[in-house]
């Protein structure tokens, strides 16, 4: 079992000072780009083209499609069934993606979704915990689940002949879990130990605080595990209420990838999921079912001089999954990339920022990120440095490179970033579990699925002028959220750092 952030790696999620406008309330006008309107038209045309059904490329006659096709059906109760079949695959991944995570909780019930994920493997009305574990082991299958801010996922990987059993097990877990009081008490201690382990991981702690300040007082600002007091107080009624409210057919997608046909999975869905309830007010997948989240320029600093490093995350408001600026923002993030001093010379990397930081010994590592949710996102960078006397230079040169994107990104770095992004996105679809994850996430968040070919076309359509446009829109002279943990005495105050968001010197 695991809980994961929206970038696919394990991620927990916390405040707290709004920044007054002060002298920075008078905005500096960003540099203009004369050809941005033309570029936006070209990109929009490419994105519209990418959403059309893919056409098989053919020179000579062929008896089958060149690429696997994602087939989608909807049952009468609203459950979506999606498959990408590979006829020669001997294994398959099947799973249920639910449009509900910690974002569907309240302050009082925060942590329920993750707690429920833990309880899923503790026995059902048909299978005891031991019988469930033994059945999965005898199949040679892999059964897992994870919770994120916006999704809860239960999936299994098995031999293709065992797909019916795998679907039956997942259905049983979702609809018939016992939620016994004794099991709840045992799992409470497990989750508390898990929370202690996560609190030791500085990166996770910083990103929790970053979400808390950027989306403070709102569902996205809460952690996935929930606060300790909630973990200690969650009861059976809380878990049952969450299931009743969120585990409805119209908010679920049953996904199959690999050795499973669409017709087979539809029949299995009809057999195992037809009795799922429907929301009182069904909302189509990809449509917002909650109020728009507001991004707040603010900061939190947790100084601990016993830590040898400063751990700092800075982020502006990013874009949601369905935004037309999603791929340009991903390309811009790829321009900065990641760097770690322990992995080799910066002279071998393409990022200008990595050269600056390496040559001046400003940081141990950095990681750029573009995290998307259904209606908003976080775009930024995570910095780790033991050069505590030069934290002001570290933030200055980092934000100076950000502002350069509004003025003078180069063709070579944009093209290189596009190639790296395509490689990362497409190579990440290796294996049935990765494909199922991609299908489920896209359908839940946007109501559709971009094929690998459509993704490649959308990335290829991003130009230098498009990078300038999104940089001017999302970076230039914008408020940011900042979270710092560790030896951060040398970190300048918010307003001083904020001035670098509109510097004409690069």
Q: At which residue positions do the language-model features occur?
A:
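N-terminal amphipathic/basic-hydrophobic helices that include classical n-h-c signal peptides
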Residues: 1-36
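Acidic/histidine-enriched segments that form metal/cofactor-coordinating
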Residues: 38-60, 98, 124-125, 129-246, ...
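M16/MPP (pitrilysin/insulinase) zinc-metallopeptidase core fold and M16-derived inactive scaffolds
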Residues: 88-157, 335-339, 343-362
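An aromatic/glycine/proline-enriched structural segment found at the starts
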Residues: 61-63, 216, 220-232, 248-325, ...
